[in-house]
From Swiss-Prot:
Protein known as: Acylphosphatase
Organism: Legionella pneumophila (strain Corby)
Top-rank taxon: Bacteria
Catalyzed reactions: an acyl phosphate + H2O = a carboxylate + phosphate + H(+)
GO molecular function: acylphosphatase activity
Length: 91
C-alpha cells in the first residue's frame, strides 16, 4: 500500500497572475490530493498538499514547472506527517 503524507512547497518566479493556484487545484483534484494553495505577499505561492506518496511525487514534478505562462525559479519542499483534508482549496 502506498504511504500517505503531506508536503509544503514554496514556489518562486513568475507564479502569481498566471493561474498557478487554479491549475494546481485542477491537477490536485485529478490526483485525489487535498490541501490548499495561496499567494504570499513576497510574490511566492505556498502549497500544502496531502495524498498518496506516488501522487504527491507527480504533483511536485508539476509544481516545479507550473502552468503554461508561469516561470518557476525555485520550488522547495518539506515532507510532513499526514493530515486529513477533505478538498483542495485556493486561498
Amino acid at each position: 500500500m502506498t504511504k500517505e503524507l503531506c508536503m509544503r512547497c514554496y514556489i518562486s518566479g513568475r507564479v502569481q497572475g498566471v493561474w498557478f493556484r487554479a491549475s494546481a487545484k485542477k491537477l490536485a483534484e485529478q490526483l485525489m490530493i487535498s490541501g490548499w494553495a495561496r499567494n504570499l505577499a513576497d510574490g511566492r505561492v505556498e502549497v500544502f498538499a496531502c495524498g498518496k506518496e506516488d501522487k504527491l511525487e507527480e504533483f511536485y514534478t508539476w509544481l516545479q514547472k507550473g502552468p503554461l505562462n508561469a516561470r518557476v525559479d525555485v520550488c522547495t519542499r518539506e515532507n510532513l506527517p499526514w493530515e486529513d483534508y477533505i478538498s483542495f482549496d485556493v486561498l
